[in-house]
Amino acid sequence: MASKEEILAGLAEIVNEETGLDTAEVQPEKSFTDDLDIDSISMMTIVVNAEDKFGVKIPDEEVKNLKTVQDAVDFIDGAQA
């Protein structure tokens, strides 16, 4: 099971691969849409890659609730349990 720090680092790598953003830009308080400029198509790719990386399922209806990087970290952390 990945720690919250490992989840954050993994998400930063996934966002970097999808968008080219520097991993240092992917901070817990950042909004995926407002701060990181991630559109819905890129977000779905990030979700699929996160599911694969962390062995969790993020239901489509939950994706809209993942507003910030911390929201995603917390969801993945809870889904691992």
Curated annotation (Swiss-Prot):
One of its GO terms (cellular component) is membrane. This is Acyl carrier protein. Carrier of the growing fatty acid chain in fatty acid biosynthesis. Keywords: Cytoplasm, Fatty acid biosynthesis, Fatty acid metabolism, Lipid biosynthesis, Lipid metabolism, Phosphopantetheine, Phosphoprotein. One of its GO terms (biological process) is lipid A biosynthetic process. It comes from Micrococcus luteus (strain ATCC 4698 / DSM 20030 / JCM 1464 / CCM 169 / CCUG 5858 / IAM 1056 / NBRC 3333 / NCIMB 9278 / NCTC 2665 / VKM Ac-2230) (Micrococcus lysodeikticus). The modification O-(pantetheine 4'-phosphoryl)serine is found at residue 40. Its main location: cytoplasm. Pfam families: PP-binding. NCBIfam families: PRK00982.1-1, PRK00982.1-2, PRK00982.1-4. Residues 2-80 form the Carrier domain. One of its GO terms (molecular function) is acyl carrier activity. Belongs to the acyl carrier protein (ACP) family. 4'-phosphopantetheine is transferred from CoA to a specific serine of apo-ACP by AcpS. This modification is essential for activity because fatty acids are bound in thioester linkage to the sulfhydryl of the prosthetic group. Pathway: Lipid metabolism; fatty acid biosynthesis. It is found in: Cytoplasm.
